[in-house]
């Protein structure tokens, strides 16, 4: 299966994570907790494409905890209970630390679905990490929110986005052997809207649409291809 560029270069360790220095930089509020493996139940709140899922996976990886993931869009109470039961069984088998249960788009869970998480969080069967693009104060039930710390992720800055582009060209196996000349980045950055995943999707679109040996990335070319793709 041909994975999207964003998935192929997804960071696997904290040192490769781009952006959110206020959380995971040298003085970040999560840095020491991750290093010590003392990760509380928490909510990651931020716009799309800002690294919420990646950060959750890295926290599990670096703290050597089992990692379970659910999407609130496709999961119901039955799925939640099944995963919690698996997490309870794995806890203590491979590690003394409780498993991480990551729920993407947790704001889409109903009250009853969120209620079904309470006992597992309260009794420490799992460490809950929820990701949301919506204000958790309005979308997460008070009983669950009071048991979680909330961390805000920001849209990627210009420097973050450019670093992401250069990392893609340097580290991705499929791009390494291509002669890519990044002449201009303004259109790419503007169209991304601070969304790292969207940036990489557009970048890959432009690269795949170019048949010549040398791939020149210019603002005009980016706009033409994106407009053509949107129309189609």
Task: Tell me what each language-model feature is.
Residues 218-232:
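C-terminal engagement/docking regions of AAA+ P-loop ATPases
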Residues 23-28, 66-100, 111:
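Short glycine-rich substrate-engagement loop in P-loop NTPases that contacts/grips substrate
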Residues 2-3, 32-71, 85-88, 118-123:
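Walker A/P-loop
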Residues 35, 103, 107-146:
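Conserved catalytic/switch belt of AAA+ P-loop NTPases
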Residues 147, 160-175, 205-209:
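Conserved AAA+ ATPase "sensor/coupling" helix adjacent to the nucleotide-binding pocket
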Residues 1-36:
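A short, basic N-terminal segment
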Residues 71-73, 149-162:
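Conserved AAA+ ATPase "SRH/arginine-finger" region at the nucleotide-binding site
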Residues 186-191, 197-211, 221-224:
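C-terminal helical "lid" of AAA+/P-loop NTPase domains
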């Amino acid at each position: 299966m041909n994975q999207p560029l964003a998935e192929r270069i997804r960071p696997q360790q904290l040192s490769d994570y781009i952006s959110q220095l206020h959380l995971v930089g040298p003085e970040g509020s999560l840095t020491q907790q991750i290093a010590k493996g003392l990760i509380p139940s928490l909510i990651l709140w931020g716009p799309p494409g800002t690294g919420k899922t990646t950060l959750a996976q890295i926290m599990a990886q670096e703290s050597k905890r089992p990692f379970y993931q659910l999407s609130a869009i496709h999961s119901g109470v039955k799925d939640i209970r099944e995963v919690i039961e698996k997490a309870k069984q794995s806890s203590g088998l491979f590690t003394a630390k409780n498993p991480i249960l990551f729920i993407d788009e947790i704001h889409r869970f109903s009250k009853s679905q969120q209620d079904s998480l309470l006992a597992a969080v309260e009794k420490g069967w799992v460490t809950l990490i929820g990701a949301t693009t919506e204000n958790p104060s309005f979308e997460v039930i008070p009983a669950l929110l009071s048991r979680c710390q909330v961390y805000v992720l920001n849209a990627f800055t210009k420097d973050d986005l450019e670093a992401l582009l250069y990392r893609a060209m340097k580290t991705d196996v499929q791009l390494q052997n291509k002669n890519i000349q990044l002449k201009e980045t303004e259109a790419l950055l503007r169209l991304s809207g601070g969304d790292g995943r969207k940036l990489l999707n557009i970048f890959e679109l432009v690269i795949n649409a170019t048949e010549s040996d040398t791939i020149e990335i210019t603002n005009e070319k980016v706009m033409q291809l994106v407009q053509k793709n949107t129309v189609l």
